[in-house]
Swiss-Prot record:
Residues 712-722 have a biased composition (Pro residues). It comes from Prochlorococcus marinus (strain MIT 9211). Its cofactor is Mg(2+). Its main location: cytoplasm. The keyword Transferase applies. It is found in: Cytoplasm. Keywords: Cytoplasm, Magnesium, Metal-binding, Nucleotidyltransferase, RNA-binding, Transferase. This is Polyribonucleotide nucleotidyltransferase.
């Protein structure tokens, strides 16, 4: 089991890549290690399915809880469905890999990354991305690599390479950059309202580090005796493409200049042109080369027609600076927005439409117990802001089975979630758990950025005090040789024909999220900088349109939203509030009809649809946790009587005992001779014994309510109590 280990010194750390030792039957395998984090990545190729017209690439990231020394909490004590984090890392591996395979590749390719050990100082995702390239190269699959990825953080004014989990949480930037020798091929980022210039500098900083990991992979290939060359482009029979260009260029070109057509009208006209060309080919002689090509592969006409349409659209953008809907390259489609369109049973709602893309977002306010428990390897706490994205088939005029959310839906939801997190109010002042759901009602490009805009509207409509509203735009790019055109607010057909999909979200102050995917093997940082800068006026324009609809949070919450009171108690007294077996807190919730959550730090949150009930529960808890001192005077009710004395509730939930000898200056034979259950009495704290029991006395205390010392704490509501 001997293998080859290569060590790369990287920003003060060592990255170890071991090849030739693990998974010997896989096409290629590498164990990548840094600190105590270890990820095994394999790449395997097998013959593709006959007639496939796409690249069947599968990337899977697998988490094993033993990697963090944990046993799964499921009934079977075995890992089940991949958690969201694993799905997102699978996408993170797929996105920079996919554009690096040749366009003719149709073989099945599977990349599997398994996290075997996790060090909290070294996140596993970027290691898995880099190792996926190395495994693919070792498998000798046709591939335009090497490719590598790094993470860039920002602590204060300093960029940090591959920060720890804790540094990511503390910092203002979480940026993943993947690149090849040709340039940057993928970006994924969350930022705390950073300027465009800061983000551009971070991308440049990250790409410099990427080049070092690329050199390490090239060195390993050389030591392994693998002579890696860029894949050769397969020769394509140009008979049919040439025929379509000759007979279809004019009608397609004329159609693409009819800017007044709707998407549906244009699609129907294109289908009509394709049908006419097909009929023309059918009329050719049987021995005609074009007809033979179609007969051997019926899908060839559709594929070649799409390629010609794509080619002509790109030419029109490069030469004329005009898009299929007549917009200028930097022009945003028509914006419409509405807030509060659903009944207030829904706590907040927003409708956002840009061109034919329409998204309905809803916001729901929940209690701390509604937080999402994260059963994965991420050491971060439970999620208190959740965004779910749904993409039904009717949104693109199609029919298909409705199943559980796929990777794309999970990824788009995570991007919209990331865009809003920097502007959410702090938990101390607004302790609600928030869930936003974005329903894509119609899709024609950039539904994820539509979800960002719709989410902002819905949250403001729900009364959530956002630090600033967030908008987003998707940027595209056409690259023909040295000619480059950047497109603002791309629609679906431009996503199909273009070379880049670059989503930028942020506030008026700065960027909160980025996501860039490529169809080419890399872009210079300068081109990426141009796209980021061109996105700013688009974001600002969209934000202005949104602000015309709603520019600040509603002053009152929905009457159907829970009301919360939040206050802090001594953490050492949490057990007192909970009581043996939870009896005390259960009694409070039943008595007041409230829901109570207590965090380890002593923060108590009370949820109720009745503000008065919440205040009553707060009084009881503060009474239980309030320290009582000798000599204090309280007025309370007799709760029970025993032969040697009577118990008085001096504070909500807190009792003291009056010994029979302390009921009167005179001798008392029976407790009932002086007091009975329900009597209101004024007592003084005589002593607190070493077991914390409160001993009271009536002796020398005037039975006058003016003498009472009963604190009335002022509630600290974090949301209006209506």
């Amino acid at each position: 089991m001997q293998g080859q280990t290569t060590t790369v010194s990287f920003d003060g750390r060592e990255i170890r890549l071991t090849t030739g030792r693990y998974a010997p039957q896989a096409g290629g395998s590498v164990l990548i290690e840094c600190g105590d984090t270890a990820v095994l990545v394999t790449a395997t190729q097998s013959p593709g399915r006959e007639g496939a017209d796409f690249l069947p690439l599968i990337c899977d990231y697998e988490e094993r809880l033993y990697a963090a020394g944990r046993i799964p909490g499921s009934f079977m004590r075995r890992e089940g469905r991949p958690p969201e984090r694993a799905t997102l890392i699978s996408r993170l591996i797929d996105r920079p890999l996919r554009p690096l395979f040749p366009s003719w590749m149709r073989d099945d390719i599977q990349v599997v990354a398994t996290c075997l050990s996790l060090d909290e100082r070294v996140p596993s995702d970027v290691l898995a991305v880099t190792a996926s390239s190395m495994a693919t190269l070792l498998a000798e699959i046709p591939f335009y690599g090497p490719m590598a990825a790094v993470r860039v953080g920002l602590l204060g004014d300093d960029f940090v390479l591959n920060p720890s989990f804790r540094e990511i949480e503390r910092g203002d930037l979480d940026l993943v950059v993947a690149g090849t020798p040709d340039g940057v091929v993928m970006i994924e980022a969350g930022a705390n309202q950073l300027s465009e210039q800061d983000v551009i500098e971070a991308v440049d900083f990250g790409y410099e580090a990427v080049t070092e990991l690329i050199k390490a992979q090239q060195s390993i290939l050389k030591e392994s005796g693998i002579d890696h060359k860029k894949p050769d482009e397969q020769e394509i029979d140009e008979t049919l493409p040439n025929y379509l260009d000759k007979n279809g260029r004019k009608p397609i070109g004329e159609l693409l200049k009819k800017f007044e057509l709707t998407k549906k009208e244009r699609d129907l006209k294109l289908e009509e042109i394709k049908t006419n060309l097909g009929e023309k080919i059918d009329s050719l002689k049987e021995d005609n080369a074009v007809k033979k090509a179609i007969s051997s592969n019926p899908k060839l006409l559709t594929t070649s027609f799409k390629s010609l349409t794509k080619k002509l659209m790109r030419e029109q953008i490069i030469k004329d600076g005009k898009r299929v809907d007549g917009r200028a390259l930097d022009e945003v489609r028509k914006i419409e927005a509405a807030a509060g369109i659903l009944p207030k049973r829904v706590h907040g709602s927003g409708l956002f439409q840009r061109g034919l893309t329409q998204v309905l977002s809803t916001a729901t306010l929940g209690t701390p117990s509604d937080a999402q428990e994260m059963d994965d390897l991420n050491p971060s706490s439970d999620k208190t802001y959740i965004h779910h994205y749904n993409f039904p088939p009717y949104s693109v005029g199609e029919t298909r089975p409705m199943r559980t959310p796929g990777r794309r839906e999970v990824g788009h939801g995570a991007l919209a979630e990331r865009a809003l997190i920097p502007v959410l109010p702090p938990k101390e002042s607004f302790p609600y758990v928030l869930r936003v759901v974005s329903e894509v009602l119609s899709s024609n490009g950039s539904t994820s950025m539509g979800s960002v805009c719709g989410s902002t509207i819905a949250l403001l409509d729900a009364g959530v005090p956002l630090k600033a509203p967030v908008s987003g735009a998707a940027m595209g790019l056409i690259k023909e040789g040295k000619e480059i055109r950047i497109l603002t607010d791309i629609q679906g057909i431009e996503d199909f024909l273009g070379d880049m999909d670059f989503k930028v979200a942020g506030t008026e102050k700065g960027i909160t999220a980025l996501q860039m995917d490529m169809k080419v093997t890399g872009l210079e940082v300068k081109t990426i900088a141009d796209a980021i800068n061109q996105a700013k006026p688009a974001r600002t324009h969209i934000l202005e349109k949104m602000n015309e609809t709603i520019d600040k949070p509603r002053e009152t919450l929905s009457p159907h939203a829970p009301r919360l009171l939040s206050f802090r108690i001594d953490p050492e007294l949490i057990g007192t509030v909970i009581g043996p077996g939870g009896r005390t807190i259960k009694g409070i919730t039943e008595r007041t009809n409230t829901k109570i959550d207590i965090e380890d730090g002593g923060i108590v949150t009370i949820a109720s649809h009745d503000g008065v009930a919440a205040e009553e529960a707060q009084k009881i808890i503060e009474g239980l946790t309030r320290k009582v001192h000798e000599g204090e005077i309280f007025t309370g009710s007799i709760t029970r009587i025993i032969p040697i004395g009577a118990f008085v509730e001096i504070l909500p939930g807190k009792e003291g005992m009056i010994h029979i000898s302390q009921l009167s200056e005179a001798r008392v034979e029976k407790v009932e001779d002086v007091v009975k259950v329900g009597d209101e009495v004024t007592v003084r704290v005589r002593e607190i014994d070493n077991r914390g029991r409160i001993n009271l006395t009536l002796r020398g205390v005037s039975q006058n309510n003016n003498d009472m010392n009963y604190p009335q704490p002022t509630p600290t509501p974090v949301a209006p109590l209506n």
